[in-house]
A protein has these predicted regions:
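Short secondary-structure boundary segments
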Residues: 4, 18-19, 66-72, 184-187
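Proteins enriched for Cys/Gly/acidic motifs involved in redox and nucleic-acid/cofactor modification
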Residues: 38, 52-82
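Zn2+-dependent cytidine deaminase-like catalytic core
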Residues: 2-56, 142, 160, 165, ...
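Short, surface-exposed acidic/glycine-rich loop or hinge patches that mediate macromolecular interfaces
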Residues: 1, 27-28, 192, 241
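Enzymes that bind and transform nitrogen-containing heteroaromatic metabolites
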Residues: 6, 39, 74-297
């Protein structure tokens, strides 16, 4: 760091300490820094070795790197399903497809995020709290609710607890005023179809310093997030059962050729109790961020 933020530049302390060598994992893509700290170290005669454990450092800081490099947070989409890709029975019953270990792991990922995002369909169907309960955490992530027509129940449990942002496509000044009195921020971002503009929302979140978003919704919103390119990573929990007919994980358009499919790379597969957790990232997104920190280093 070579600029004044919440604290003075740490490069000043390093130069004053005069070590023979400094080892770093990656550069800082923040335009206020962008290699200036490394240049100052080298100008002071300090040897610098960069790129050590680069991939580990990128994984640890991926949300910040994404926001600095492209202006939007890193989003992972959490979905739980049967082996045949069903997230609920035809009557809507989904509790619980996965076991307690998988559900606790999902709360770990909520805790890691800056914000937990869901849609009004999930709120109306399940009235979830969307907070962290199954693991300990020093703070609750912010909550984000997407609701096109502003049909927000004022007694929804999601509105309690951690700070909440609501994105809508339709103004309702009276309801917005009631929510504002509870500290809830409402932002209207309509697209041409009368839905919430998801691309504009991601840019808005980036401007408000949200690094990582944990999305956990129903098949319609999941599909919309995937179709618009908001999702960088999939967090899939697979239960060892077959459900047959029922809700899909995501509502996606019909493809006619295999080369139209979005490709992912597996980054981790592990067993949690009786279930499997699969992590998969959009390869091009990861490589773009990796290149950004390599260049900065």
């Amino acid at each position: 760091c070579s600029h004044y933020g919440r604290t003075p530049p740490c490069v000043d302390a390093l130069v004053a300490a005069a070590p023979a060598r400094v080892v770093i994992a990656m550069g800082d893509p923040n335009p206020q820094v962008n290699g200036q700290g490394l240049a100052r170290l080298r100008a002071a005669g300090i040897a610098v070795t960069a790129g050590v454990l680069l991939d580990d450092a990128l994984a640890l800081n991926i949300g910040f790197i994404a926001r600095m490099h492209r202006g939007t947070p890193w989003m992972w989409l959490k979905m739980a399903s049967s082996l045949d890709g069903r997230s609920a029975l035809p009557n809507g019953v989904s509790q619980w497809i996965t076991g307690p270990d998988a559900r606790a792991d999902g709360h770990h990922w909520r805790a890691r995020s800056c914000a937990v995002l869901t849609g009004i369909g999930t709120v109306l169907a399940d009235d979830p709290q969307m907070n962290v309960r199954a693991v300990s955490t020093p703070r609750q992530p912010r909550k984000i609710l997407l609701v096109s027509r502003f049909e927000v129940p004022l007694d929804a449990r999601l509105l309690d607890g951690a700070p909440t942002w609501i994105f809508t496509a339709r103004e309702d000044a009276a309801k917005a005023a009631v929510l504002a009195d509870r500290g809830i921020v409402v932002t209207c971002l309509p697209d041409a179809a009368g839905k919430v503009d998801l691309t504009a929302m991601m840019q808005w979140l980036g401007r408000h310093e949200i690094n990582e978003v944990h999305a956990e919704a129903g098949e319609k919103l999941n599909g919309s997030l995937l179709r618009t390119g908001c999702v960088d990573e999939l967090l899939l929990y697979l239960a060892p059962m077959l459900l047959g007919e029922g809700a899909a994980m995501a509502k996606l358009p019909v493809l006619t050729q295999l080369d139209q499919a979005q490709r992912y790379r597996y980054t981790d597969v592990r067993q949690l109790g009786d279930d499997l957790r699969v992590r998969a990232q959009v390869e091009a997104r990861w490589q773009s961020l990796r290149k950004a920190v390599e260049v900065a280093a």
